Amino acid sequence: MYPIQVIAEDPERTAQAAELATRLQQQMAESPFALVWGEQHLELRKLDEPKLGPVFVDFVEGAVAHRRKFGGGRGQSIAKAVGLKAGANPTVVDATAGLGRDAFVLASLGCQVTMLERHPVVAALLADGLQRAQQDSEIGGWMRERMSLRSGPALENLQQLGFTPDVVYLDPMFPHRQKSALVKKEMRVFQSLVGADLDADALLPAALAVAGKRVVVKRPDYAGYLNEMKPGMSIETKSNRFDVYVISR
């Protein structure tokens, strides 16, 4: 893994920082990347590009909270792609969770979502955001019921799920051409730290093997099909495409 510093800016977080550094098997060495425990949350910083700002997970406020309240509910393309309809709340495995935005949208609409995240730094950010959201007075109740996280390689996690989800959702990292300033910032930090999803093509057959009803792959509108496998249908949005592979066994 790329070297990363773990820093406790808040003295009360010193023990948590030490535990995280041990878990990540990181010494307190110099690195352009730092996981920083502040008073409010855990955040990732690229120290040699401070203008990029910090990256952290926040399910309670900001863009994801706005989308939960005003994003179109079950009429959203992602909801249609996973098969959300009246009386049907699919169980979903998000095998490429990242910062958990899509998983959160699906959970807020009623899905039971298990997030898988391969990179330990991203998983640490996600775990912190999840814990804070579960303690929130407004959304904590259903967050505890509907969202969970497993860290580790996606392929291994898929093969060792122990249950059959209705849907496996894939959104492998892809070089984005046009994105909002926020995502551009995050992509620059992420791609230099995390790297590309080199096993992305292999994820599709693995997902098809474990999903009960469908596999959904989110792609930029200009990207080819994952693993060059043509889906049964596609749902197009302004800048993305949801390729849907329906399971027939």
Curated annotation (Swiss-Prot):
Claim: Protease is one of the keywords in the record: no
UniProt KW keywords: Cytoplasm, Methyltransferase, rRNA processing, S-adenosyl-L-methionine, Transferase
Compartments (UniProt record): Cytoplasm
Reactions it catalyzes: guanosine(1516) in 16S rRNA + S-adenosyl-L-methionine = N(2)-methylguanosine(1516) in 16S rRNA + S-adenosyl-L-homocysteine + H(+)
Single GO molecular function: rRNA (guanine-N2-)-methyltransferase activity
Main location: cytoplasm
Documented EC number(s): 2.1.1.242
Keyword Cytoplasm appears in the UniProt entry: yes
Domain of life: Bacteria
An annotated GO cellular component: cytoplasm
Binding-site residues for S-adenosyl-L-methionine, renumbered to this chain: 101-102, 117-118, 171
HAMAP family: 16SrRNA_methyltr_J
Reported function: Specifically methylates the guanosine in position 1516 of 16S rRNA.
Family the UniProt entry places it in: Belongs to the methyltransferase superfamily. RsmJ family.
UniProt protein name: Ribosomal RNA small subunit methyltransferase J
Source organism (scientific name): Tolumonas auensis (strain DSM 9187 / NBRC 110442 / TA 4)
